[in-house]
A protein has these predicted regions:
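Long, charged low-complexity segments
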Residues: 2-181, 222-307
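Short, contiguous, well-structured surface segments enriched in hydrophobic/aromatic residues
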Residues: 176-193
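Short helix-adjacent coil turns
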Residues: 181, 200-201
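Amphipathic alpha-helix face/heptad-repeat signature
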Residues: 182, 206-210, 257
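Generic structural signal for well-ordered, non-transmembrane alpha-helical segments
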Residues: 184, 191, 211-212, 288, ...
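Short, hydrophobic, well-ordered secondary-structure elements
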Residues: 187, 193-194, 201-225
Length: 307
């Protein structure tokens, strides 16, 4: 029965939200699914389920009911309903602080620019006849304030721009890799490594997860092409050795210095070897450079099916 009062609507939404939670859906996944369930259950076929229109009609009319679904989730869960479409982030050091540069999710091409005016975010939606999508790089730096942005020198803005450009290609390469189950694991390791590095006190975890990401990317590339790779013993986790195999079998020459910096011994993982911020950041930067080189080799521009 269609609710006709706020009390009836609240009771319906609490019950529906509990049902969706029991199915394992997180807060960000529930608004659209809730709107679909309400539409199907109450026979509201043909009514837009996304809301957003200012013309909602009468209270508890079909359009108003579905708009209330989104209102209810926004009021109840707030930012937890927001979906983060970013493919990933890179970390840089500036003025002694670690900063996260979160990459935007872009469908198609876009133009990058950098401006200390953070209100100038760019044009994020391109329509026919309109300028192409544009993005202010400083708006990707998490926690950047207008006051801090205005203090940046020209060289510092160029540093940020360079890290964004190379980091974007690296992150998109990792995000687009297909054809081996290791790639999904590598993406998780990468996110964990960035999160750990940004905390400032999980540095051993950051280094280990960085090495795990590199190891699984390299093994995934080898395995995808049918080449053998070590699975146990010292060479099973030897990043430099895996780099040699990638060069031998795939013709991609990865810098030995970067492979060595990314490599991490089990002693780090188990807390037997102390890690510093400098070591963890150096490993992260080396991994980003390796992923950038793999992007230039176009290892992600294939039509491999998901495993």
């Amino acid at each position: 029965m269609r609710p006709a009062t706020s009390e009836e609507y609240e009771k319906m939404m609490v019950s529906l939200d509990g049902h969706l939670a029991s199915l394992g859906l997180g807060p960000a996944q529930r608004p659209l699914n809730a709107a679909l369930v309400v539409s199907a259950t109450l026979g509201l076929s043909g009514t837009p389920i996304l809301g957003g229109s200012s013309d909602r009609g009468e209270n508890f009319s079909p359009k108003d009911l579905l708009a209330r679904v989104h209102d209810w989730y926004e009021e109840t869960y707030g930012d937890r309903t927001k979906i983060d479409f970013s493919p990933g982030s890179v970390v840089i050091s500036l003025h002694g602080n670690l900063w996260e540069i979160k990459m935007p999710k872009v469908w198609g091409s876009f133009r990058m620019f950098i401006s200390p005016d953070l209100s100038n975010t760019g044009n994020h939606i391109a329509t026919r006849g309109a300028p192409p999508v544009q993005h202010n790089i400083l708006c990707s730096v998490q926690g950047m304030t207008p006051a801090y942005a205005k203090r940046l020198s020209k060289d510092e803005m160029l540093l940020l721009a360079g890290n964004f450009i190379n980091g974007y290609e690296a992150v998109m390469c990792l995000d687009d890799l297909k054809g081996h189950s290791f790639f999904d694991e590598a993406r998780v390791d990468y996110r964990h490594s960035v999160d750990a590095l940004l905390t400032g006190h999980e540095l051993s975890k950051a280094r280990w997860d960085t090495a795990q990401c590199a190891e699984k990317v390299l093994k995934g590339l080898l395995g995808r092409d049918g080449h053998a790779y070590p699975t146990s013993g010292r060479k099973g986790h030897d990043i430099e050795h895996l780099g040699d195999l990638v060069k031998e079998h795939l013709g991609i020459d990865l810098p030995t210095a970067d492979l060595a910096v990314v490599h991490c011994s089990p002693a780090v993982r188990y807390g037997q070897e102390r890690s510093t911020t400098e070591q963890a950041l150096a490993a992260h930067e080396a991994l980003v450079r390796l992923l950038h080189l793999l992007a230039q080799a176009r290892v992600h521009h294939t039509h491999w099916p998901d495993p």
